[in-house]
Structure formats: structure tokens, C-alpha cells
């Protein structure tokens, strides 16, 4: 069905076609029908498009709004009749159907070119955690993008794709190897980590006009014995979590005065530096500290560590050893272990749903309930990627939304209410797939890349103001945002 005419025609015909009484509701006040709008009789042949036309007619919208429809918390992907049959529901029942705005297609906004692979990205905006924690005001148009690269440098970009600031080289207090993770802690502080085994804190400052700035070394944190794969920050408690290939989770303070001394055996040895390096470093003195704790329980590299969104004294970690572990950060003790069937490569918390999303080496995302009362390990599986899922971020607009970045060269948007049932149980399907703009520009958008060769996505961030920001092997930051369909 491709328009609403079927509804009109059928509604006026004799009762030759099955009908069902539906109650249309919405939790979004600006699109809700009046409270006194009772159930209406509609043909069971209606699908999403015709239902959307019906709701727009009932609302009296001059400009139609695309809607999605949910029955019992699941998106309607068939006709009403097929849904009733599949779920054993009588057409005599009054069916409650919730409608929501359809997701806006994420269009390409901009790409920022780098000299090397881009491993990590973060956003500073009025709605980003760093600004929210600090109660800072970021004016529209003054948002910043942070990137961490395999060339060992941090860069801060403005929305006009100009570099505002670059971190110093290794000789001047910068990273001595590739950066794997970078986050804004506050609007004036950045945390980064990478293959040089250090977590580093930086003071970020801008000129008054905002077109230039500096990233100055502030604190070096030593404790890991192998590369660091990811970071999580929590500015209100001045805490950082790091995930390392040495099988441990690092727990750190962002404040020099709170942190213990750095382990002597892990500090850069003066003997290992060339005379030229010593000379260059002589003007750069950066305080060095150690971890508050190293959480050791995993038996393989730790890929991700995050804070519980509702309780920063709780941490979660995911590892190549197939396990998800829950930590009490006050006592530095292991609380719970959930073992899955595959290596876990990324992690995100969906707090309102009491779920953790974990990206796997087996190309899917598993949703895990970490609560002790949970009877099953995996609550749902999200399938669609064709290579490892290495980055995850929540949808800032929706409790049910998630985005994933994969080595297959795509980012996929998920709404966990968009499901189907197959031999593996309830399986989620992606709502949109975002490809790399670099392929399109090369005229190779239809070219099948084995495993995402050349365009692997390494990091994705979803900001309410800026949009979806992803980074990857194509040496680019890419920004996509839902524009051009709805103004609201």
C-alpha cells in the first residue's frame, strides 16, 4: 500500500473486509491526539504508511509527518491483519497502537580529513556530557569535535572543519605512540590513552574568538603494562576507567592531589632517551601519577570499560575472554561475571532498560542484563554487521536507540523495538546503515569491501546537537545528522 486511499475506500465499503477497533496513542505531547479521541474502526489490511496518513489526517497536519507504530512495544512491520494472525489476537479486541515520529534519515554533513587512521572521536556541545557536567554554555555553532589518531596526536576541530588545536609531539610532552581513545572530561580538560600505555590529561583552552586554541600536557598516568584500548570519564567524581591489553581495568583520578605516586618501574627511563630527546624534553615537566586501582580478573585483553550511568561507583568491563564483568569501584572488587560465547569488543550502557550492549567479534551486538536477578545472559541479539562491532553509543533522543561502528565500514542505527523472531529467538534489525562518504567520493559506494578493507570504522559518538560522528581507517571524521525530512 503506498497511500492512504485504501483506508478511505475500505472504510466506506460494506463490511466485506475485516476491521479492528484501534486506540491510537502517543507519548509525545506535541503529536498526541486529544484525550477524548476514542477507539476507531480501521481495516486490518492497513500497514504503516496508511496508518501514518490516517494519523496525519486526524491531527490535521498540513505537512505530513512520517510515523512509526508500536503494538505491545514492537514496531509494526506487517499489515495489522498479519500481526493479529501471527500473535493469535482476535480482531474483536481493541488494539492499542502507539505512534512515534519516524527516525530521520542521517544525511552526510561533513568530513574532516586526517593524515593517519582516526581511532577515536568525541564531541563538546551544549548537550554533551562534558558540558552538562560542568554546567557550561556552548553556543550554537561553537561546538567542537575531538579526534585521536594513529599519528599520536589529538586534534580539536570546529564545525567548519578547521583545526583549532593540536596536541604536542612526543618530544614536547605528547603521546609516544598511537592514540586509541580520547574524551572531553570538561570543556577545558581532555583525557587520552593509547599504545604508549599511558593515560594523559590535557588542559584545553581557546582564544576569545574560538578559532585557535592549545592542548597542553597536564598529567601523565602510569600503571598499565600494555596498550590501552578505551577510556571512560566521569567528571563529577574526577574518575577515569581504562581498558588495557594487559588484561586489566585501570581506575584513575583526574586530580593530581588525589592520585598515588606512579610506579617507578613503568616510568620512562632516562637512559632510554637519546640526548636529543632529553634536550627537547628539558622544557616540558609533566606531573606523573599512578592508578587508584588496577582491576585484574580478566584473562585476555580488556576492550572496553565504562561507568554505570546511574551510579558512578559501579563499573563494567568487556574482554576478549568473552566475559562482561561488574566492579564495585569503591572497594575495587569484582561483583559479577557474565560469560558469553564470543570475544567482546565494545560496551555501552542503556540505563533506562537496565541493559548493557556489547559488540562482538562474531559481528553481532548482544544485549545483556547485568543485574544479579537476571535469569539469562543475553536478552536480545542485534544482527546486521558483517565484521567485528568495535564501537557503540546511545541515541541521545531515545531510550531504545543505539548506534554501532564496525570494521565492515558502516555504522548501523538500532531501535531495539524493531525485532523479529528466528531460530535464535528475538533478534533486532538495524533501522539505518551509514556508509563511509569516502567510498562514495571514489565512486566505489557499490563496491563490496572484504571485511571493510580501507574503511573500517573505529569509533562512533552520537551527540544530540551535532549528530553522529564516526572515525575510521579512511583517515576521516565523518558527521551525519538527520536533516531535511522534519523540522521538529
Swiss-Prot record:
Where are WD repeat segments found?
128-167, 174-212, 223-262, 297-337, 339-378, 384-424, 452-488
**Where are the stretches annotated Ubiquitin-like (UBL) domain?**
20-101
> Mostly located where?
nucleus
PROSITE patterns with a match to the protein in the record: WD_REPEATS_1, WD_REPEATS_2, WD_REPEATS_REGION
Gene Ontology molecular function, alphabetical: ribonucleoprotein complex binding
**SMART domains given for it?**
WD40
* Region feature (Disordered): 256-285
InterPro entries noted in UniProt: G-protein_beta_WD-40_rep, NLE, WD40/YVTN_repeat-like_dom_sf, WD40_repeat_CS, WD40_repeat_dom_sf, WD40_rpt, WDR12/Ytm1
Name the chain's protein.
Ribosome biogenesis protein ytm1
Source organism of this protein record: Neosartorya fischeri (strain ATCC 1020 / DSM 3700 / CBS 544.65 / FGSC A1164 / JCM 1740 / NRRL 181 / WB 181)
- The gene that this protein is the product of is ytm1
